């Protein structure tokens, strides 16, 4: 009897974990129109710059690779803010990846932290928020322009490029919805 009860409980538990939300939003849900205006005035230029930077780097290896461990982010309908938060927090995990050029990592972190700031959100892990503190006090003269890292291809870089593309698409979707 006990074993049957035990098995029935633990069959439901994984289902509950799958059905539960990935992360509860830690955003101070602000006025969406204000968020759009802040994005357009403050952040959109940096997002465009980051997309242009990512286009400069080789991506032929990214097109042919299937990423076993990569996270795919979608901009969920009616949950754009939570989607943007999740993407921004995920992008911060690439900040210390040495295989990606320093200037590209810093720009990605700047966009991620800017997104979190505009949305008034926080990441679940405080380590990622420390990156934003580091980025906000960063001296831009310190960045490198490494041609050698442009030639290298690695999974982390491909994942970051996909994340950047998703982030931009989600911001565009958010803008269109709010403009209606």
Where are the model-predicted features located?
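Cleavable N-terminal signal peptides of Sec/SRP-targeted secreted and luminal proteins
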Residues: 6-24
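Extracellular/luminal segments of secreted precursors and ectodomains of membrane proteins
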Residues: 26-180
